[in-house]
Design a protein with these regions (language model features):
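Conserved nucleotide-sugar donor-interacting segment of glycosyltransferase catalytic cores
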Residues: 77-142
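Donor-nucleotide binding loops and adjacent catalytic segments primarily
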Residues: 11, 191-282
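Short, polar loop motifs at secondary-structure junctions
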Residues: 25-31, 99-102, 184-188, 249-257
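A short, glycine/small-residue-rich beta-strand->loop->alpha-helix junction that serves as a flexible
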Residues: 1-8, 228
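A donor-sugar binding/catalytic signature common to diverse glycosyltransferases
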Residues: 93-99, 124, 272-301
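Conserved nucleotide-sugar phosphate-binding/catalytic loop shared by glycosyltransferases and other
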Residues: 16-17, 21-72
């Protein structure tokens, strides 16, 4: 939800100013449900179909892209061709890409104006080579250079086949794009940057999704963890056993499991919770790391 929620208020404001806003998202049904109050055109974004492959820990931005499909040239070609076809259909004047490097590469090939927005994770420092994803690890420069080379050897042949210019560095994914680093300095994945403007997080939350809060006081606990998380059930069981008033947002949980897990002191929502309300009703949030929710709660104290 975080990626779409970063785009939603911007799309709303652009539409208010008379722009025609077109969304391209992988899950059209879910996107339409989340954007149901707004009259947007929603297109199906290209979906990665790279075959499964074991990868080592993603220690750089390029390694993360490779493990998510960029290693497979045919899938990457299909991705870029899909975006180019989508641009031909939508005829955009500008592309606003939120953690969408393939869309940026396709827009680069098509010569379309583009804006790259995101958190520190999705907008890395544009150095050559790029730094490691885990600042607490010290990676040899030769490893960083090797990661860049591996990425370029996978991507550049595909770009050339499509008639696009090759990249000289991984940072060229963002070449020509206006960059909007939408986070706080304290939450930047790569640590504080002195040469970049921090625009702050995009705070957006559904206003019409009311949760059932067990306590009328501000002593509830808000949990935002997906059911597939390995500690999900242990956390729910512990909260129930301790009798702590809690609300859990568990996207993807079945109705049967919801009924089985709920208790007198614990309610579970299958739909996004109004986080601004949650910030006034809870004293603690347990989350698996969502940037939007974490930033909102921290700013609320």
């Amino acid at each position: 939800f975080g990626h779409l929620f970063r785009l939603a208020p911007i799309g709303l404001e652009l539409a208010r100013r008379g722009c025609q806003v077109v969304y391209a998202i992988p899950d059209v049904a879910r996107g339409a449900a989340l954007l149901q109050t707004h009259a947007y055109r929603i297109l199906h974004a290209p979906v990665w179909q790279a075959p499964p492959k074991e990868h080592s820990l993603s220690q750089t931005y390029s390694k993360n892209l490779l493990r998510n499909g960029y290693w497979h040239r045919e899938s990457l070609r299909n991705q870029l061709q899909g975006w180019l076809a989508l641009f031909d259909d939508a005829q955009p004047d500008v592309i606003l890409a939120e953690h969408a490097p393939s869309a940026l590469l396709a827009a680069r090939k098509a010569g379309l104006p583009r804006v790259a927005m995101g958190t520190g994770f999705s907008l890395p420092p544009l150095t050559a080579p790029m730094p490691g994803l885990q600042p607490w690890f010290t990676l040899p420069e030769r490893y960083l250079i090797k990661s860049e080379k591996e990425f370029l050897e996978c991507v550049n042949p595909v770009l050339r086949d499509l008639g696009a210019s090759a990249l000289t560095a991984v940072a060229d994914v963002f070449e020509g794009a206006i960059q909007l680093l939408c986070t706080l300095l304290e939450l930047d994945h790569y640590g504080a940057r002195t040469d970049t403007r921090y625009w702050g997080p995009v705070i957006y939350t559904p206003q019409d999704s009311e949760a059932v809060w067990p306590s009328d006081k501000r002593d509830n606990i808000f949990v935002y963890i997906r059911p597939e998380h390995r500690f999900f059930r242990q956390i729910i069981s512990l909260l129930k056993e301790m009798g702590l008033p809690s609300v859990t947002f568990a996207p993807g949980l079945s109705h049967e499991e919801q009924r089985a897990l709920e208790g007198e002191n614990l309610s579970i929502s299958l739909h996004p919770v109004n986080l601004k309300e949650a910030a006034t009703r809870c004293r603690l949030m347990i989350s698996q790391g969502g940037h939007n929710a974490g930033a909102l709660m921290l700013l609320a104290g």
